[in-house]
Each structure stands twice: as C-alpha cells, then as structure tokens.
C-alpha cells in the first residue's frame, strides 16, 4: 500500500512515511539592527558601552537552531547513504542482467565509492 506525497512522481510506502523525521521549522531572525535616523548620538554610545554577553552565553534560540541544523544534517547524511546503497544495488542488478559482458566492456560506468560520503562527519550528541 503506497501513498502519494507532495511530489506527484514520488511514491513512499506508508511505513517509511510514518518513520520520517519532520524537519524543524525555520525561526525568523533579524539580519541587521534597525537604528532610527532620528536617534541622538548618545544612544549609539550607550549601545557601545553596554556589556556584551560572554562567549559561553548561548541563547535558547541559538541552541534550538543548532539542534535543528544538527538533526537536518543527520537526516541528509542518512538519505545520502541510502541513495548510495540504492545505486550500488542497481549496479549489481544491471551487472547480473547483462551476462557475457566483462566489467571492462560494460556500457555503464562503474560506481566507485564516493569520497565525500567516506569523509562525512560522524555526529554524536
């Protein structure tokens, strides 16, 4: 039993959909600070003299964003590994279906292990 996902050509078994990890929603963050043009210069001086948080200070928003990025990166790594496994399985199937062709005479290029996947960081919490 398969269900259609948001992509019309992609079918995902219901079991896989149930196990899918939802991606974190992005939180809006200001890209710059809006300073009022009518602000007196003293306000600017006050901003400079305020005590900045220490390096060890980690706001909850940053930690939440980092956790989302971490989870998304883990998911992307897992998907890339699954895609490589599918490609390797496909290559093995094609090789079995084409008897009499040597590996040197094959019209399909051999899949070599992707060096990028071998050097993916192993994340641990």
UniProtKB/Swiss-Prot annotation:
It holds the Pfam family SSTK-IP. GO terms for cellular component: cytoplasm. Residues 103-125 have a biased composition (Low complexity). InterPro entries: SSTK-IP (IPR031679). Residues 1-23, 97-125 are annotated as: Disordered. It comes from the Eukaryota. Residues 1-12 have a biased composition (Basic residues). Keywords: Chaperone. Expressed in testis but is absent from mature sperm. GO terms for molecular function: protein-folding chaperone binding. Co-chaperone that facilitates HSP-mediated activation of TSSK6. Interacts with HSP70. Associates with HSP90. Interacts with TSSK6; this interaction is direct and recruits TSACC to HSP90. Belongs to the TSACC family. This is TSSK6-activating co-chaperone protein. It comes from Homo sapiens. The gene is TSACC.
């Amino acid at each position: 039993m398969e269900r259609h996902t948001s992509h019309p050509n992609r079918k995902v078994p219901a079991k896989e959909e149930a196990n899918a990890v939802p991606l974190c929603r992005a939180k809006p963050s200001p890209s710059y600070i809006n300073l009022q043009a009518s602000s007196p210069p003293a306000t600017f001086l006050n901003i400079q003299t305020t005590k900045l948080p220490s390096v060890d200070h980690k706001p909850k928003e940053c930690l939440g964003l980092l956790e989302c990025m971490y989870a998304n990166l883990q998911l992307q790594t897992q998907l890339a590994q699954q895609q490589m496994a599918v490609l390797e399985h496909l290559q093995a199937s094609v090789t079995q279906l084409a008897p009499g062709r040597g590996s040197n005479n094959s019209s399909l290029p051999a899949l070599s292990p992707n060096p990028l996947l071998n050097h993916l960081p192993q994340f641990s919490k």
